[in-house]
Amino acid sequence: MKHGFTLIELLVVIAIISLLMAISIPALYQAREQAKMTVVNGELHGIGLALEAYAMENEGLYPPTRADCNPWARKHTYALPQELVDSGYLPKGEIGKVRFAKIEDKYNEGCAYKYIAVGPKYDYLGAPFGNQHLYIPEGFPSYEGENLIKYNDFEVSPVTWALFSLGPRYDLQSLEEKDFPLKEGFPVSKRFWYSPQTGEGILTRIRLVNGRQIGSFESK
């Protein structure tokens, strides 16, 4: 004669299943997030190669930064430069008047990865927009002093350009209200970079003046 499960047995089974789910779900999420970051770092590496190829064809000069204070362009500020499209290195993206290299940031749906280079800056209509600057910690990258030094001349800046993804847990709503905190050392200062300990921060690839590329992809 066959007997069904008793209530106690069912409760034990449910408890075991719940325990297994509690253990496995965070691990699955972590694995998925790690895979996503691997893809992003790989794409930033590829964009870095495209920038170097562009510079080789243009007497060592890199594409200008693009930014715009108009509402229709704010979320696309510092989008990947259209020069990489014109040179055939990256696919074309266009939203309204904003034209850029289309490789979507996996952490910022509908927007490309960001690019900031010390030197000339233009708006999305092609008009000069002054010089793009970066505030870089004194001693970077060997160490980060308390003082931030403003650079707007690529010939003296220790950083040539910075590529970045918004990374996990970035406050997207803040981008609708204000610009990135450049005056605080963003995106160069390592305190803004992704940290495995906190699980948040931007994913970066930065070219130093000596040609070396560093970034959050080096984090263990």
Question: What function would you assign to each model-found segment?
Answer:
Residues 2-29:
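N-terminal single-pass transmembrane signal-anchor helix
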Residues 16, 32, 36, 151:
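Conserved aromatic-histidine-acidic binding/catalytic patches
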Residues 17, 25, 33, 42, ...:
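A short linear-motif detector with a strong N-terminal bias
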Residues 22, 28-78:
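Conserved hydrophobic/amphipathic alpha-helical signal-anchor segments
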Residues 60-220:
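Low-complexity, acidic interaction segments enriched in glycine
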